[in-house]
Curated annotation (Swiss-Prot):
CDD domains: Transaldolase_TalAB. Belongs to the transaldolase family. Type 1 subfamily. This is Transaldolase 1. NCBIfam families: PRK12346.1 (NF009001), talAB (TIGR00874). InterPro entries: Aldolase_TIM (IPR013785), TAL/FSA (IPR001585), Transaldolase_1 (IPR004730), Transaldolase_AS (IPR018225). The active site is at 131 (schiff-base intermediate with substrate). GO terms for cellular component: cytosol. It comes from Pectobacterium atrosepticum (strain SCRI 1043 / ATCC BAA-672) (Erwinia carotovora subsp. atroseptica). Disulfide bonds: none annotated.
C-alpha cells in the first residue's frame, strides 16, 4: 500500500487543483479551486472550449462591458468546476471574488449566483462548497448561506480566532493554511529548521482539531496549502486534507508507513459564548502572522482574478 492509499484510511483526500488530468490520476473524494488555480487551468489547451463557452455566455447575457466580464469570469469558474465534478464523487469548492471579502451582502449575492449557475447545469448545491475568505464579513455571509442550505468553505484561515468564529457560525468547512503559516515563520526566523512536530502550521491545525472535537463542533477541518509531505503526514487523521498534484504524486510513489496522528478527544466540553465582532477583531489582530497572511492572501487572489479578467476581456 502506498502512502496515498494509507492516508485515505484516516483522512478524506482532496485534490487542490483545477487540472482534470491530475485529478483523475489520484482519485480524490473532492477538489478545491481558487482564482490562482482557475487562472492556471484557463491557459491549458484542453480548457479552451470552457473558456470559449464563458465568452459566448457573457455576450449572450449582454449588459455593460463590466457586467459581461463578471459573467464570463463566473461562468468560467463554474465550467471548470462542472468539468472537475465529472471526475470526482464528492464536491468542488468554487471561490467568491476576493475583492468582495469585506462586503457581507455581496458575498451572499455572489454565492447565490454561483449556485444558480451550477443548477443551470443540473448540478445540485449538495455537490458545491462556496469558498469565502474568513474575514468577519465572510464568516457572517457563510452563516447566512448555511441557513439556506448553501455549504461554505472558509479559506485563508490563519488565526485561532478565525477558526473559532467559523465554528460558532456553523460553517460547513474551514481551510487552515499550513504552508503559508510555515512560510511566514521561515521568513521571520530563517535559521529555524522546523520538523513536522514543531512546524507552526501543523501545530495550528492540531490545536483547531483538538478544540473542535472537544467542543463537538460539526465544522469540517481541511488542512490546506502544504509545502512538503512531512506536513501532510503529521496531520494524518485530520477530517480532510487538500493536496496539490505534486505532493499527491510523492505520496503515491512512497510505501513508507503512515500512522494516524490526530484522533478526536473523548472528552466533551460546553462551547464558550460566541465571539463578538470586537472580540474577534481583537483576538485575530493579536496574531501578527495571521494579519499579514490574511491580507496578503486576499491581495494575491484578487491579483490573479484581475489577470484572469484581462484574459477574458481580450476575447469579449
Amino acid at each position: 500500500m502506498n502512502q496515498l492509499e494509507a492516508l485515505k484510511q484516516f483522512t478524506v483526500v482532496v485534490a487542490d487543483s483545477g487540472d482534470i488530468d491530475s485529478i483523475r490520476q489520484f482519485s480524490p473524494q473532492d477538489a478545491t479551486t481558487n482564482p490562482s488555480l482557475i487562472l492556471k487551468a484557463a491557459t491549458l489547451p484542453q480548457y479552451q472550449p470552457l473558456f470559449d463557452d464563458a465568452i459566448a455566455y457573457a455576450n449572450l447575457q449582454g449588459g455593460s462591458p463590466e457586467t459581461r466580464l463578471i459573467n464570463a469570469s463566473d461562468r468560467l469558474a463554474v465550467n471548470i468546476g462542472a468539468e472537475v465534478l465529472k471526475s470526482i464523487p464528492g464536491r468542488i469548492s468554487t471561490e467568491v471574488d476576493a475583492r468582495l471579502s469585506f462586503d457581507r451582502g455581496m458575498c451572499v449575492a455572489k454565492a447565490r449566483k454561483l449556485i444558480g449557475m451550477y443548477q443551470e447545469k443540473d448540478i445540485p448545491r449538495s455537490r458545491i462548497l462556496i469558498k469565502l475568505a474568513a474575514t468577519w464579513e465572510g464568516i457572517r455571509a457563510a452563516e447566512e448561506l448555511e441557513k439556506e442550505g448553501i455549504n461554505c468553505n472558509l479559506t485563508l484561515l490563519f488565526s485561532f480566532a478565525q477558526a473559532r468564529a467559523c465554528a460558532e457560525a456553523g460553517v460547513f468547512l474551514i481551510s487552515p493554511f499550513v504552508g503559508r503559516i510555515y512560510d511566514w515563520y521561515q521568513e521571520k526566523q530563517p535559521t529555524s529548521d522546523y520538523q513536522a512536530e514543531s512546524d507552526p502550521g501543523v501545530i495550528s491545525v492540531r490545536d483547531i482539531y483538538d478544540y473542535y472535537k472537544r467542543h463537538r463542533y460539526q465544522t469540517v477541518i481541511m488542512g490546506a496549502s502544504f509545502r512538503k509531505v512531512e506536513q501532510i503526514l503529521a496531520l494524518a487523521g485530520c477530517d480532510r486534507l487538500t493536496i496539490s498534484p505534486a505532493l499527491l504524486e510523492q505520496l503515491k510513489n512512497s510505501s513508507d508507513p503512515v500512522e494516524r496522528q490526530l484522533t478526536p478527544s473523548t472528552e466533551a466540553f460546553h462551547p464558550p459564548s460566541p465571539l463578538s465582532e470586537a472580540e474577534f477583531r481583537w483576538e485575530h489582530h493579536q496574531d501578527a502572522m495571521a494579519v499579514d497572511k490574511l491580507a496578503e492572501g486576499i491581495r494575491l487572489f484578487a491579483a490573479d482574478q484581475q489577470k484572469l479578467e484581462a484574459l477574458l476581456a481580450a476575447k469579449l
